[in-house]
Amino acid sequence: MASEREQISRKVALIALIANLILMAGKVFFGLVGDSEAVFADGIHSAADVVASIAVLAVIGISNKPPDQDHPFGHGKAEVISEAIVGIILVIVSVYILIEAILSFVKGPSVPQYSALFAALISYVAKEILYRYSIKQGKKWNSKAIIAIAYDHKGDIVASLAAFIGVLLAIIGNSRGWSYLLYADAIASAIVAYLIFKISMELIRPSVDVLMEKSVDPELIEEYKAVIFQCDQVKRIDRIRAREHGHYKLLDVRLSLDHDLTIKQGHDIAREIRNEIKRQFSDVEEVLIHVNPYFEE
């Protein structure tokens, strides 16, 4: 039976998939009918979001599987892979939109219609709601997959806002005879491309760090040390390493205890420390503790 975390993750991803399908169809249609490069480009972005949502749905079940013989540390990194996939998709989309914006400058500006303006506005409102919901659930369940979806929605928010402003300026320019404002739609497309690329980097960089097993923040290491030193028998921490493994963390600790202690006493102390760390840090999945004998110098 799926855990509550997995059920919520699937629900968020499914809502994102359905919303992106509807918004994609609407923005592509009204972008073409309403003669707006920016809204059409935003629609292509939503098409990529559909692919991203499917990718996230595919890995949610995998990431929540318990450890097995082939994957003794669990499957948490599957979420990180989905985060990287979403980031790569957004890079491709940003490049495509930028190329289309440049071509729009070359062939000359078009005059967007009000239908394109309303499509951008509806997209902005819908994505704002979806972002707030997704980021809340992502942080609550410490899910990189859901947070990736939230960042994707965030990209749509700024993209739809830029498209709305660009279309509005172009419409105003056409009605007032200010021809230079007709280029606002194409400029908005270029801005959309930049903003999407920026958000893609916010997804790719941390996912690469996790896949390369970068250490957690030094401040968090100090918090782990403070918990360990709560045990009076600990004479010294020889080494402590911690890394993210998707939605949970793994710790490797070497510490020194008095050399007169028996193996059982050392084992019991290590178990108490392990349990206390996991009690205080709910996202810590495993703590491997190696005990060294301590001699007074």
UniProtKB/Swiss-Prot annotation:
Phenotypic consequence of gene deletion: Deletion mutant is manganese sensitive and accumulates high levels of intracellular manganese. Effects are exacerbated in a mneP-mneS double mutant.
Entry's induction text: Transcriptionally activated by MntR in response to manganese excess. Expressed at a basal level in the absence of MntR.
One GO cellular component term: membrane
Gene3D superfamilies membership: Cation efflux protein transmembrane domain, Cation efflux protein, cytoplasmic domain
One Pfam short name: Cation_efflux
Protein origin, superkingdom: Bacteria
Keywords: Cell membrane, Ion transport, Membrane, Transmembrane, Transmembrane helix, Transport
GO molecular function, one term: monoatomic cation transmembrane transporter activity
Function: Primary efflux pump for manganese. May prevent manganese intoxication.
Protein name from the UniProt record: Manganese efflux system protein MneP
Organism field: Bacillus subtilis (strain 168)
